[in-house]
Amino acid sequence: MHSFRVSMGTISALFAVCWLLVSPSRADDKQMPPIKVDVLQKGASTSKVMEQALADLPLDQLPAESRQRVETVLKNRSLFRRLPTIGMGADPAVYHYFTRNPEAAVGVWRVMEISQFKLNQTAPMQWKGDAGDGSNGSIEILHRTASRQLLLCEGEYKSPVLPKPIKAQAVMHLRTDYPDKAQSNHNIVHDVDLFVTFPSQTVETVAKVIAPVSNSIADKNFRELSMFVEFMSTAMHTHPGWVEQVVQRMDGVKTDQKEEFLKVAATVFVASRKNELQQNGVQNASFEDLIAPYQGPKR
């Protein structure tokens, strides 16, 4: 049991964002619409899927030094997992913001008291995180396009009962597609290919033994992370006041990131209200039309 906890703690240091359960039900006095994402394809770890994942890595787009670091993890990989393919209706602008400002997502979790996890940006494409339970890690984005992100992660787990920290490295390949609205019910479809290596042979052995359990947890948490993006997109559409209050209370997030957050929220809200009004026959909505549902009773 202790080995299981240690191994899971090490993995959580790499991907702490995936361990948080998001289950908001009300943002203010208005009931939130149901938050839902669709699992389009289950997670998999087969050799065939792994070979496809390896072939899909954008290694030719990396500088020599970065490519070597990635290939070291791949060569010594202990575990592979393709997380579920998930479809969601979230606004792409919201998804785009959080994938480029992960510390803002952590800031929201802290305000909502979901977690006290800390994530700080240390360079333009690098972050360090601390879960506060002995787990800590770093994330570096090596390659980024509108539809792909390749990340190199390092993490460790420290405990008074262990003679030395247990460490791990991972390569994560986030793949995102934006389906044609005429052909899909989803605005976003994404998945992650995950390659993990443990320097310790003992930890690797334990990790392989508990892989069915850890795979299930990783799949579940990726779905819940997707639900968080869906939740925030829904909140921006329907509860702009609540979103503004959350942004004002966030810590560990730069002023310009907060301003961008609010701009994204305002853009999403206005577009949503205009669409709603157009469906009700109002083609040229005024500012008063847009904010009417959020004003108090006239005196």
Where are these regions (language model features)?
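Bacterial N-terminal signal peptides
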Residues: 9-21
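N-terminal secretory signal peptides that target proteins for export/translocation
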Residues: 1-7
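Glycine-rich portal/gate segments that line the openings of hydrophobic small-molecule binding cavities
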Residues: 119-174
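Hydrophobic ligand-binding cavity/cleft-lining segments
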Residues: 29-123
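Envelope-exposed proteins and targeting segments
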Residues: 79-84, 91-94, 147-149, 168-170, ...
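Sec/Tat signal peptide C-region and signal peptidase I cleavage site
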Residues: 23-29
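Solvent-exposed loop/turn segments at secondary-structure junctions
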Residues: 104-105, 156-160, 196-200
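Terminal "cap-and-tail" regions of soluble proteins that handle hydrophobic small molecules
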Residues: 30-62, 175-299
